[in-house]
Amino acid sequence: EELVEEALKKIFSDQQYAIHDPEKTESWIKFTLGMIQKALKTKGRSRSIDEIKQAIEVMNKCNIALYKNKKEIWSGAILQDLVTVGREEYLASTDTHHIARLPLFISHSINNLDYRQFNYDRLMSCDEQLTRWLYKRLINRFTQASHITEYSCMYSDIKQASGLLQQNKEGNNRSKILSAFNELKEKGVILSCKINERKIGRAITDIKYTIKATPQFIKEQIASNKRTTDIRT
């Protein structure tokens, strides 16, 4: 579902398929299954039409919630108010246009011009889902990336926030994070990652990861900051 979601947001960025109402804070996207399939195939992430159908079903029917300070601030589906040609033909044709409303927080970001631009090609080239999750986190959190700044995060936070560390053994979960960070090194995002284990006795209770960015990622973050500033002024 996550890759299909990214493809849809990329399609939305093409104004030909985007409808945004700033007064109502609503954003709608027009798409076909064929458009999604082509967008994924172009980035080496080919999916069958049936897989795309299932992903859209999940994004439309599953409810997610956002919390701030342990208080729910938003609840809804990733694809809301899905409009199709009829239940019999529901997502049956690769050439049939469908329309869906994007979540409120996306519309709010567009209205306030506080969304982050990033390297979409690099995101889609990452093989591991956790790698893509960490990459998007760095894009949004490591906004002041420079040659002298570092970004730190905790294992416990990654596990809770990502929902992608479901192994029974914590050692396997930790290995999965290291694999994701290594892929980010290969993709030219992070230069180094220092590991500081927190222990009680011999037991590891948490891990602190301290990251330095590559010159390329620093350059991209600076450019993204400038574009955001230019748009707002």
Model feature map: region roles:
Residues 1-233:
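Charged, alpha-helix-forming regions
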